[in-house]
Regions:
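Short active-site oxyanion
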Residues: 1, 29-32, 64-66, 102-107
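Short, well-structured N-terminal submotif of metal-dependent ribonuclease cores
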Residues: 1-34, 46-58
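Alpha-helix capping/helix-boundary segments
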Residues: 9-10, 38, 74, 96-97, ...
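Conserved SAM-binding loop
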Residues: 12, 67, 90, 108
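A general structural signal for well-ordered alpha-helical segments in protein cores
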Residues: 20, 39, 53, 75-78
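Acidic catalytic patch
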Residues: 64-86
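Acidic, PIN/NYN-like endoribonuclease modules and their adjacent C-terminal/linker elements
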Residues: 98, 102-130
Length: 130
């Protein structure tokens, strides 16, 4: 099974937040990927906290999470998910993660409880870390 990490899951791990143990276990034992859109989200949050952007790439390599470039197929699917996720306020980054999970037939991993309200509608299995 492949796991697709949302920015919230990676941030929880990197910052020792609740749910970090769940993410750590997945990364140690399973194949994990992350959309380049979600990498940008994580990087933005970490830069806001003073981390150098170059450190993000090193950290992802150390975590053994494979980055996946956001391509036209993902972008099109991401846009199509807008209608079924708008009512719970999912962002572009959220939908990018869900789109990638749908395409790779993986499980999306997040700390955002709103995702459980749309998982069935977008045909993606969602694992809540908290």
């Amino acid at each position: 099974m492949m796991y697709v990490m949302d920015a919230s899951a990676l941030l929880a791990l990197m910052q020792g937040e609740p749910g970090s143990d769940v993410v750590d276990e997945l990364i140690q034992e399973q194949e994990c990927v992350v959309s380049s859109v979600n990498i940008a989200e994580v990087g933005t949050k970490l830069v806001d906290k003073g981390l150098a952007p170059a450190q993000l790439a090193r950290t992802l390599k150390e975590l053994n999470v494979q980055p996946i470039d956001f391509d036209l197929e993902q972008a099109t699917l991401c846009a199509s998910l807008r209608l079924s996720t708008k009512h719970v306020g999912l962002s572009l980054g959220d939908r990018a993660c869900l789109a990638l999970a749908q395409l790779v037939k993986g499980t999306a991993v997040t700390g955002d409880s709103a995702w459980s309200d749309v998982a069935e509608a977008v045909n993606v299995k969602v694992l809540m870390i908290r």
